[in-house]
């Protein structure tokens, strides 16, 4: 029983992987050392572009 649960866990982790750097806008954001957020940017950050094909915001620190 333990082995079957472990195999199911490994299989589910393998099938549901998320590759975050697949989009061109996401790669540009990460290369500029900015951070992608699906919701609003944090308090001391501004939105400079988009990530994940326009679904998220690329946020840059203000200081």
Swiss-Prot record:
Does the keyword section mention Disulfide bond?
yes
Example of a GO cellular component annotation carried by this entry: extracellular space
Q: Keywords on this record?
A: Antibiotic, Antimicrobial, Defensin, Disulfide bond, Secreted, Signal
Q: Name the domain of life this protein comes from.
A: Eukaryota
* Signal peptide residue numbers: 1-21
What the entry lists under InterPro entries is as follows: Defensin_beta-like
GO molecular function terms listed in the Swiss-Prot or TrEMBL record: CCR6 chemokine receptor binding
Where mainly located? secreted
Please give a single GO biological process term from the UniProt record: innate immune response in mucosa
Name of this chain's protein: Beta-defensin 38
- The species this protein belongs to is Rattus norvegicus (Rat)
């Amino acid at each position: 029983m333990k082995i079957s649960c472990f195999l199911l866990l490994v299989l589910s982790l393998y099938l549901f992987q998320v590759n975050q750097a697949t989009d061109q806008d996401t790669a540009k954001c990460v290369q500029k050392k900015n951070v992608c957020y699906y919701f609003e940017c944090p308090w001391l950050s501004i939105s400079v572009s988009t990530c994940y094909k326009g679904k998220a915001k690329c946020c840059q620190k203000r200081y």
